[in-house]
Amino acid sequence: MNLYKSIEYDFEDKIIDYLKSIGVDTSKIDPKTLATSIDLLAKKSTPVEKIIFLVNHYFAKEKIIFAFRHNVSTIFHSYHHHDFYELIYIVEGKGELFVDEKKYLLKKGDMAFVPPNTLHKLIIESDEENLRCIMNFDEKYLKSLSSPNTDLTRFLGILSKRNTNLISFSNVDHKRLLSLFNRLNNNYLSRDYGDDLRVKLSLTDIFLKINSCAIEEEDSTIINGFNENSLVTKAIEFIDKNYQNKITLEKISDHLCMSVSRISHLFKEETGLSIIEYTIKKRLLLAKKMLLEGESTSKIADSLGFSSLPSFYKQFKKEFKITPKEFLIYSK
């Protein structure tokens, strides 16, 4: 593990600096427990309840954030989402990744990609030796690194076509990628002349390798999700197809031929969310997209099955820590 210059909290420090630059009081925020600190402060209804959104806003502006995590457990054990792509690379150890209805048992050499505004959760326990690389990136940024003959976003289309979020690397490819990530790590931390360009070169090499492996495996099958016949999978599929309508627990239970109490218990046990919570999250993610497309809040609330406009506003602010109007302002 000594090969890696640890930057476990480097991007948290960057976020703190960013928040200070826009006038947010960060005196009560510990960079080492940023997400937890934000959550606690937000629950107290302080002015920093907007921070979670602002962090997403910062990521969107920066285009790429990178860090190694060594023996650090995951904070979010329930479904959450981001406004950017997330790359999760298991260097050592193992973990469980849930992306909508899919479940992946991650091991050394596995790399997973979570698209923007996709419900997911990663579970890695701190009592086991683990090292993972986390990278948040913007698809447009990868496009900017591409050439007319080489599209660095090609692997995203391959994964989508194969209905998976996972690429598994051989031992040889794994060692090569570690070397590339270590080089990126050093360049990313450095402030020497030319290191901004070296970061771009390192990123280009990394995504060239990722694309090459994805293309080689295009015809193989590496999906290891929920049992395709599992009731939770069927429930999620039903919700994903119908969440824009006014679906109820009774409709879901009728579809699955199972009691409301039983499917509710299984769903909560498997996903960490209640069926209602999951459905609301799916609706709110679509609401963000509709807002950016110019739809009115009243039309969004009605078309997505919210009981009233005040109910929509309340749920939106609860989820994103910001009102729909503020969301549009910060998204400009």
Regions found by a protein language model. Name each.
Residues 66-82:
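Conserved short histidine dyad/triad with adjacent acidic residue
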Residues 109, 262-267, 311-312, 316:
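Short hydrophobic/aromatic patch on the recognition helix
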Residues 1-4, 303, 313-332:
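…primarily DNA-binding HTH/wHTH and HhH modules…
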